[in-house]
Design a protein with these regions (language model features):
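Zinc-dependent deaminase
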Residues: 1-8, 25, 51, 56, ...
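Flexible, acidic/Gly-rich N-terminal and inter-domain linker regions that tether
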Residues: 1-36
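Short beta-strand segments
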Residues: 16-18, 62-63, 144-148
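Cofactor-binding loop segments of dinucleotide-utilizing enzymes, especially the Rossmann-like FAD-
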Residues: 22, 65, 93
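Local cysteine-cluster metal-coordination motifs and their immediate loop/turn environment
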Residues: 30, 37-38, 60-79
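A short, polar/charged loop-to-alpha-helix boundary motif
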Residues: 33-45, 163-171
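Mobile, glycine- and charge-enriched loop segments
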Residues: 43-70
């Protein structure tokens, strides 16, 4: 679900949230666009009026630690506390310096049971550009080249096309996901 925000969430990370009560999904959302509501806000907004009373008995699953600071939107950790959810499952800690464990601490300080690290590698891979930028203070670098079967860039005799329609499409997809070329 978080991957739905691929084109529009950046420079923010892609985040998904699912609210579950006794094995039934009662709310879900993702971070659609930078500067707009985060995944948790959208998940709570999707809960039917008839199910709102179930929130105190529900678990919210989030792919990235809920934010704990004011930016363009209020802190999601505060919203989770206000909604009365008693259990939060977090995919991975947010590497952004203004969050970096503070959202988890805020939830735990409010008496909420928090589990961290569920599908952690997958959640980090989804936001690898965000993680590299925040942890290594540099852009995520991706290399692309095309070569012949014997390791050359062309056959040396005549112009040739080395890529297939599929790889051309794949390259355009990767370029669309990249901030710079």
């Amino acid at each position: 679900m978080a991957a739905n925000g691929l084109q529009n969430a950046k420079p923010n990370p892609m985040v998904g949230a699912v609210i579950v009560h006794n094995g039934r999904i009662i709310g879900e959302g993702y971070h659609v666009r930078c500067g707009q509501a985060h995944a948790e806000v959208n998940a709570f907004a999707s809960v039917a009026k008839a199910d709102e009373h179930l929130l105190s008995e529900s678990t919210i699953y989030v792919s990235l630690e809920p934010c704990s600071h004011y930016g363009k939107t209020p802190p999601c950790a505060d919203l989770i506390i206000a909604k009365g959810v008693r259990r939060v499952v977090v995919g991975t800690i947010d590497p952004f310096a203004k969050v970096k464990g503070r959202g988890i601490d805020k939830l735990r300080d409010a008496g909420i049971d928090v589990t961290v690290g569920v599908l952690e590698k997958e959640c980090q891979w989804l936001n690898r550009r965000f993680f590299v930028y925040n942890l290594k203070h540099r852009p995520y670098i991706m290399l692309k080249w095309c070569q012949t079967e014997n390791g050359f860039l062309d056959d040396g005799f005549k112009p040739c096309r080395l890529s297939s329609p599929f790889t051309t499409m794949l390259v355009h997809k990767l370029r669309a996901e990249t901030d710079a070329i």
